[in-house]
Amino acid sequence: IEDVTRRAAKAGYLAIAPNALSPLGGTPANEDEARTKFQELKAEDNLKNFIKVFDYLPLRKDSNGKYGCVGFCWGGAMSNNLAVNVPALKAAVAFYGRQPAVEEVVKIKAAVQLHYAGLDERVNAGIPAYEEALKKNDIPYELHMYEGVNHAFHNDTAPTRYNEVAAKLAWQRTIEFFNEHLK
């Protein structure tokens, strides 16, 4: 996540990576322990903590007032939920994230970009209903399916899942999307 934040900053954006596990004492160095900690989070409280970032951003002198978010896996679901719950959001990018409840989609004011892994049947099962709701509510969106790759294809620290070609294309699309909606 820190590397993705660095990449967004290098692309010219004010980039902030909230630590979802801060209320539980921070992120353990051991990834298995960190995954276990995520199970302890209360979804509603966690969403409120992430929304507070958007209360903070207007206070920064280096903010242009146009806000976006990007998330991966659990963070992809968070990006979708932020799109529903932060009216000031202009662009939300979700990588292989669980979709919001269909009845909540009407609240989205941001343009949405979605990246999915072709082999990710669990997450992909929610795509048809989400896409239908986006269309029904005239929400601008892009949906990109990367065939033949697994969930977490953008995670270059997971060699069994990382797919360099798909990851580079998805990141290029993300920055282009941000350039279109946040500059």
Predicted regions: what is each one?
Residues V4, N124-L134:
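Short alpha-helix in the alpha/beta-hydrolase fold that links the catalytic acid
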Residues G71-G75, S79:
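Gly/Ala-rich beta-loop-alpha elbow adjacent to hydrolase catalytic centers
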Residues I108, L114-Y116:
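Short beta-strand/loop motif that positions the catalytic acidic residue
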Residues L119-N124, H151:
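Acidic catalytic loop of the alpha/beta-hydrolase fold
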Residues K135-K183:
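C-terminal catalytic histidine-bearing segment of alpha/beta-hydrolase fold enzymes
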